[in-house]
Amino acid sequence: MNFEKIQYIERKTGEIKTEKVMGEGALKFLYYNPFGKLALHAVVKRKFLSDWYGRKMSKPESKEKIKSFVEEMEIDMSEYKRPIEDYASFNDFFYRELKDGARKIDYNENVIVSPADGKILAYQNIKEVDKFFVKGSKFTLEEFFNDKELAKKYEDGTFVIVRLAPADYHRFHFPVDGEISEIKKILGYYYSVSTHAIKTNFRIFCENKREYAILKTEKFGDIAMFDIGATMVGGIVQTYKTNSSVKKGEEKGYFLFGGSTCILVFEKNKVVIDKDIIENTQNKIETRIYMGEKFGNEKN
């Protein structure tokens, strides 16, 4: 398989852009080189490496990396509450908070919004996933949930992936009002969730560390909200109160250092995904989306 640049659609303009990727050379080695694949399975996917790097990025000296990272990744710091010099470590910077009003949230009760900043793929029917990325192995909801009954509940449902790159805002939020459950944690590995990694094996989502909660809603049914760990993600922190009422746009939690993914799973016939996102997904290209931005409607 050839190594390709990661391209995506800038939704506001329709322009095709190339993503700036941190550690692109390493990703190429790990997922496209036979020796790299050996290293990936022997070391890189393991918890100890992500834990070690997470601790390293929490040390005071790590803050020296912030300025160059911001410049290289062209991050607009005017959107955030604190300036570069205020962060105690790179990790402190990594889960930085937005200023109030930095993201426009669509509060129309009939629409659902993105839980995070990132690149989105959406499958109106979960069965469509196998057509796009999986080769030689099948993605199953039973493995993903690690629960046969829940897999049955969401059979033929809708599957939405929001991939967060390292340069993105790394807090995630509720996509609609509802009642949120406690967190269920599923142990797993720490593979990268970059587009390069997913193209080689979509089942990474069934193998990585992940946790989920069920958001019970009035108009969109019971939404399974997954937060997925990845290479170098030191942890997933949930900041919400379990078994409570939540509002669209309220913070749910954040990822520590690394890139990672939020996945929403809907029951069958509960949501209609926006046409542009479906078309881009069918063309195997992600769409840029921001927290609070609409990606679908209630199915009437």
Swiss-Prot record:
Q: Which NCBIfam families match?
A: PRK00723.1, PS_decarb
Give the enzyme's EC designation: 4.1.1.65
Query: What is its subcellular localisation?
Result: Cell membrane
According to UniProt, residues marked as the site described as Cleavage (non-hydrolytic) are G259, S260
Binding note for cofactor: Binds 1 pyruvoyl group covalently per subunit.
Q: Where is the active site?
A: D117 (charge relay system), H173 (charge relay system), S260 (charge relay system), S260 (schiff-base intermediate with substrate)
Q: Which GO terms describe its molecular function?
A: phosphatidylserine decarboxylase activity
The annotated subunit structure for this chain is: Heterodimer of a large membrane-associated beta subunit and a small pyruvoyl-containing alpha subunit.
Q: Which residues cross the membrane?
A: none
This enzyme catalyses: a 1,2-diacyl-sn-glycero-3-phospho-L-serine + H(+) = a 1,2-diacyl-sn-glycero-3-phosphoethanolamine + CO2
Name of this chain's protein? Phosphatidylserine decarboxylase proenzyme
Its pathway is: Phospholipid metabolism; phosphatidylethanolamine biosynthesis; phosphatidylethanolamine from CDP-diacylglycerol: step 2/2
Record family assignment: Belongs to the phosphatidylserine decarboxylase family. PSD-B subfamily. Prokaryotic type II sub-subfamily.
- Species this chain originates from: Fusobacterium nucleatum subsp. nucleatum (strain ATCC 25586 / DSM 15643 / BCRC 10681 / CIP 101130 / JCM 8532 / KCTC 2640 / LMG 13131 / VPI 4355)
Instruction: Report one GO cellular component.
Output: plasma membrane
Q: Which cofactor does it need?
A: pyruvate
Q: State the protein's purpose.
A: Catalyzes the formation of phosphatidylethanolamine (PtdEtn) from phosphatidylserine (PtdSer).
How does the protein's chain sit in the membrane according to the entry?
Peripheral membrane protein
Q: Which InterPro entries match?
A: PS_Dcarbxylase, PSD-B, PSD_type2_pro
GO biological process terms, alphabetically, are: phosphatidylethanolamine biosynthetic process
